[in-house]
Design a protein with these regions (language model features):
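Sec-exported extracytoplasmic/periplasmic mature domains
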Residues: 48-53, 89, 93, 99-106, ...
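Short Gly/Thr-rich strand-loop-strand
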Residues: 62, 102-145, 171
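Stable alpha-helical elements in mature extracytoplasmic
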Residues: 39, 43, 47, 90-98, ...
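A short acidic-to-branched-hydrophobic micro-motif
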Residues: 78-98, 153-158
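Extracellularly exposed regions in secreted/surface proteins, prominently low-complexity, repeat-rich
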Residues: 17-18, 30, 35-41, 127-175
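N-terminal "mature-domain start" segment
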Residues: 31-68
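Exposed beta-strand-loop-beta-strand "reactive/processing" segments of non-cytosolic proteins
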Residues: 67-77
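Secretory targeting and sorting signals
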Residues: 1-31
């Protein structure tokens, strides 16, 4: 009987230790600095084609950000090498972050626009503005930075080259 008692005691200890390990890992994975899961999921619904929570990571939020996601290389080999997405609590905060995010870029025209700098963009065939878009380069990489005003989302994609027109075309197709 003592062998059975020892075996039961060892099994109980193993189960308890495993439960504590699972509990500790769940607590460690929950990071309050990345916002709540509802906001992260809302933001994830606004990612460019090919990106999702399977290849983007929640980042610590600051100020008026509700959620932030950083993504690496697009699954599309012609796509960006990096993307970042931010969800804000208000349109004013979105506009301020947009202005701040483009201030160090060398701005160029976007596509067939004649404007160097921020310009309105339209989603699909819509005639109403969806937000602002800016195209340019920063530290030897092309960048497209845009807002989706109705959703308070700021988005950013970056290429490994300075080919702004190619990145802009990718964005128009997949953005």
């Amino acid at each position: 009987m003592s062998h059975l008692a020892d075996a039961l005691r060892a099994a109980t200890t193993a189960v308890l230790m495993g439960s504590f390990a699972c509990l500790a890992s769940t607590t460690a994975a929950a990071d309050p600095n990345t916002g709540n899961s509802s906001d992260v999921n809302t933001l994830a619904g606004n990612l460019s084609k090919g990106y999702g929570l399977n290849n983007c990571t929640a980042q610590p939020i600051t100020g008026s950000q509700l959620a932030a996601l950083t993504c690496g290389q697009s699954p599309d080999p012609n796509g960006p090498v990096q993307a970042k997405y931010f969800l804000f609590s208000s349109g004013d905060d979105l506009a301020n972050w947009f202005k701040t995010s483009i201030k160090d870029d060398v701005l160029t025209t976007c596509g067939d626009s004649s404007t160097k700098g921020p310009a309105p963009w339209h989603q699909g065939n819509a005639t109403t503005n969806a937000g602002q878009v800016a195209c340019g380069t920063y530290q030897d990489g092309a960048e497209i930075i845009w807002t989706t005003d109705a959703k308070n989302v700021l988005s950013y994609i970056r290429a490994s080259t300075t080919d702004v027109p190619a990145l802009y075309q990718w964005w128009r197709t997949n953005g």
